[in-house]
């Protein structure tokens, strides 16, 4: 799925649910169209300055997504192959394994390449 297909006769459906991602080959931090993903990744330093489109499956963004429901977050530099500097995240933090994730809450950030950082969450009293 590395060939250029956006704007050609090959639609995203012909890639088995994949989507065309306007992105630069040298810059993995980019924004995918909202219609083909579950997460909107908008790193501050990653401005779309693409010269050609590449196609990827619709999956979690490269630089983002501690919990799949958030926006405006970038992985720590130790995880990300590019120099992302956005560090304020809105991840789904978990107090215990039986807590339901809270997708909108006070900003917090993940430790590098690790588990979500402890945050204030609202947990269901019922079992998961």
Curated annotation (Swiss-Prot):
Which residue ranges does the record annotate as region 10 X 5 AA repeats of C-C-[CDPQRW]-[ADPRS]-[CIPSTV]?
Answer: 5-112
Extract the coiled-coil ranges from the record. none
Q: Which cysteines are joined by disulfide bonds?
A: none
Source domain of life is Eukaryota
Q: In which tissues is it expressed?
A: Expressed specifically in the middle/upper portions of the hair cortex, in the region termed the keratogenous zone.
- Family the entry assigns: Belongs to the KRTAP type 2 family.
The protein, known as: Keratin-associated protein 2-4
Cellular-component GO terms for this entry: cytosol; keratin filament
Q: Which UniProt keywords apply?
A: Keratin, Repeat
Query: What exactly does this protein do?
Result: In the hair cortex, hair keratin intermediate filaments are embedded in an interfilamentous matrix, consisting of hair keratin-associated proteins (KRTAP), which are essential for the formation of a rigid and resistant hair shaft through their extensive disulfide bond cross-linking with abundant cysteine residues of hair keratins. The matrix proteins include the high-sulfur and high-glycine-tyrosine keratins.
* Alphabetized InterPro entries for the sequence: KAP, KRTAP_type_2-like
Oligomeric state and interaction partners are given as: Interacts with hair keratins.
């Amino acid at each position: 799925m590395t060939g250029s297909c956006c704007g050609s006769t090959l639609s995203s459906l012909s890639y088995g649910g994949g989507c065309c991602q306007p992105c630069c080959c040298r810059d993995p931090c980019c924004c995918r169209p909202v219609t083909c993903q579950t997460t909107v990744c908008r790193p501050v330093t990653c401005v779309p300055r693409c010269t050609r489109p590449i196609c990827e499956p619709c999956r979690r963004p490269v630089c983002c997504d501690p919990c799949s429901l958030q926006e405006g977050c970038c992985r720590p530099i130790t995880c990300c192959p590019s120099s992302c500097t956005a560090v304020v995240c809105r991840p789904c933090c978990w107090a215990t394994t039986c807590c339901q994730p809270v997708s909108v809450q006070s900003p917090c950030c993940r430790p590098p390449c690790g588990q979500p950082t402890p945050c204030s969450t609202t947990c269901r009293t019922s079992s998961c």
